[in-house]
Amino acid sequence: MLAPASKARVAHARRLHRRTFRESAGEFLAEGPQAVREAVAAGAVRELFLASADAARHRALADDALAAGARVYDASDAAVTALSGTTTPQGVIAVCARVDVGPEVALGTAPRLVAVLVAVRDPGNAGTIVRTADAAGADAVVFSPESVELANPKCVRASTGSLFHLPIATGVEVAAAVALARLSGMRVFAADGGGDHDLDDELDSGGLAAPTMWLFGNEARGLPTELRALADAVVRVPIHGRAESLNLAAAAAVCLYASARAQRARR
């Protein structure tokens, strides 16, 4: 039998919708069975709220959370609605501890594939890139200071649990990230639609087989000149049809998977 969620615990969790409170508490909300399952596995869950109607269905998840030391509550429909960031709550909401790490942790273990988000402002794009980096086997993701907050609810949802799978460093200056990459012997590529290097050519020539850091710029402005200059090459994704361009998350997926393919072929 789960303890009922008190008004005080619901109020605390609800305040995590505000960035200032997330930062001061060192906590954020994850919602949905998949994301929460990954959070529990990572040991990040502090509190778990289960809708009364769904508690029996998610009993295994509740047991895992309890075994990991989390507090698990039976929550009313009103409480779940208040905590949810969607119009159709899934009935599973967790208060999680911050998961971001310092750049030395994320980049200090000879990584082979890293994605750097440079002033990426759309949380859906950011979360999707985290998910894609995880799927492609990347070793880390880095957020620049100007990028959207990793714990933004839309970013957390878009990552679908992947933010609990790999090291993510936030608030890192791009020049500092590149410097750490150089110490590890990585090549640095800047993704840009106007780049003078073609991704297919880099793939065919073996240029992507080396350990690689990708820089992905702002959705509207791309990468500034001074950051493009830090890269070994500015690379464009070829457009073979009539589309004007790819959106940021799609372009990042193509680039990351091209690197992953080249690196697997070399092994």
What are these regions (language model features)?
Residues 33, 53-55, 78-79, 99, ...:
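Short glycine-rich anion-binding loops that position phosphate/pyrophosphate groups of nucleotides
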Residues 51, 75-76, 118, 144-145, ...:
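Short beta->alpha connector loops at strand-helix junctions that form conserved
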Residues 92, 112-115, 210-217:
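Generic beta-sheet signal
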Residues 94, 134-136, 147-163, 225, ...:
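Structured adenosyl-cofactor binding patch, chiefly the S-adenosyl-L-methionine
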Residues 189-243:
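Active-site/ligand-binding-proximal alpha/beta "capping" segment
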